[in-house]
């Protein structure tokens, strides 16, 4: 339910309407702390403001805890994160979700950010637009919606959010290219949509072999100026990249099984619906 916690208190000691506690024993015990330390009081008030729903907050914190931070995809620096509406599209498993969570982790004002997945059970009986309304009322500034195509009528509600909340920054991702393309047509005047591919060879070398190779223009490559620095014989690495280097999870245990799952879900869920 909608519960906002004070530092060091449990949900049972908080008014279940989501407001500050009534004049109860718990609240009276809290008053000396407010008088003693205004800084702590300010921190508590901030916690009150940013927490919309316990299950969504806990889900976001768990996802952020699992997010690796040592490597960023090439697209990370190109995304205008402060634009009003941004979409990131691409195949399953290439790192879209990781990239937006990395941005949240790297932002000092992440207390006003909310990360949700459109297939979360919360949306079984809640509307996306209602969540945005409440989030803005609670002081939220950045809403990140993962796998947005899992939410029916997502493009219409994103248009509504865009038109109603001009100060809210929304970033959404989608893996179902067909669904995203259909919805993006409705959002063409509003959303900046960035396609994301799998790892490039340069990214593969940096992620798995710690080789940071510079980029070269086509003219430089044709002029023979481009070379893979840090590796004396790059061809074996390139063959390895062609075999399994497209996905960031290729170095994990069970890569083949997970790759098969990605292919199956793409065929059975994304393509079959069309």
How would you label these PLM feature ranges?
Residues 169-175:
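Structural recognition of the conserved hydrophobic beta-strand(s) that form the central parallel beta-sheet
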Residues 63-81:
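Pre-Walker A adenine-sensing motif
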Residues 96-97:
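Conserved lysine of the Walker
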Residues 88:
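Hydrophobic anchor at the beta1->P-loop junction of P-loop NTPases
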Residues 111-139:
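Short glycine-rich substrate-engagement loop in P-loop NTPases that contacts/grips substrate
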Residues 178-193, 208-209:
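Short regulatory helix/loop adjacent to the ATP-binding pocket of P-loop NTPases
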Residues 35-36, 42-61, 206-274:
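Interdomain hinge/linker elements that couple catalytic modules in large macromolecular machines
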């Amino acid at each position: 339910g909608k519960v906002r916690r004070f530092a060091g208190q449990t949900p049972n000691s908080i008014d279940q309407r989501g407001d500050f506690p009534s004049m109860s024993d718990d609240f009276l015990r809290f008053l000396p702390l407010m008088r003693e330390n205004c800084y702590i009081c300010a921190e508590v008030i901030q916690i009150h403001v940013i927490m919309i729903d316990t299950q969504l907050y806990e889900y976001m914190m768990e996802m952020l805890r699992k997010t690796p931070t040592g490597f960023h995809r090439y697209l990370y620096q190109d995304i205008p994160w402060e634009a009003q509406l941004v979409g990131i599209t691409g195949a399953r498993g290439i790192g879209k979700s990781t990239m937006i969570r990395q941005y949240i982790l790297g932002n000092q004002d992440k207390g006003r950010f909310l990360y949700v997945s459109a297939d979360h059970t919360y949306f079984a009986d809640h509307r996306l637009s209602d969540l945005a309304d409440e989030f803005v009322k609670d002081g939220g500034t950045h809403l990140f919606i993962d796998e947005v195509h899992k939410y029916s009528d997502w493009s219409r509600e994103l248009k509504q959010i865009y038109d109603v909340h001009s100060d809210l920054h929304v970033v959404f991702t989608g893996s179902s290219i067909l669904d995203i393309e259909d919805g993006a047509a409705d959002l063409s005047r509003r959303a900046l949509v960035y396609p994301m591919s799998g790892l490039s060879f340069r990214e593969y070398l940096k992620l798995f072999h710690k080789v940071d190779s510079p980029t070269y223009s086509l003219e430089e490559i044709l002029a023979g100026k481009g070379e893979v620095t840090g590796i004396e014989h790059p061809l074996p690495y390139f063959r390895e990249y062609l075999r399994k280097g497209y996905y960031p999870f290729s170095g994990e245990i069970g890569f083949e099984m997970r790759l098969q799952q990605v292919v199956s879900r793409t065929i059975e869920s994304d393509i079959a619906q069309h």
